[in-house]
Amino acid sequence: MLPDRESLTVEFKSEQRRPQSDDEIVDNVVALANTQGGTLYLGIEDNGIVTGVSEQHSNINGLAAFIFNKTVPQQTTRIESFHEHGCQVVVIEVDNSQQIVSTSNGKTLQRRLKADGTPEVVPLFVSQ
């Protein structure tokens, strides 16, 4: 069963108008890993309506390899695909990391809740 809304550990990504960029997907995986872990759903609108994933992200093996190669330290994710209301949804499960995770291009991100209770991705500043 799909969650009905986003939270600190649940993120919906729409691909109805345009595919998410690969960088946007990796940014969200990094943010989830640096917070509490969680689940990224591709093909679901922010309001929970299923609209389907793009062809670009329907290959789950390629997506897993891409995420692994674009995270430091490399993150292993669990990815599955299913159909809901005739639309393909891709689910990316991200574990909470025991060490700080960054993108391969140096972005370190985390998730937090805004005052209205909705989640956002923000920079994670690490002390040297």
Model regions and ranges:
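Conserved N-terminal catalytic/coupling substructures associated with nucleotide/phosphate chemistry
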Residues: 1-128
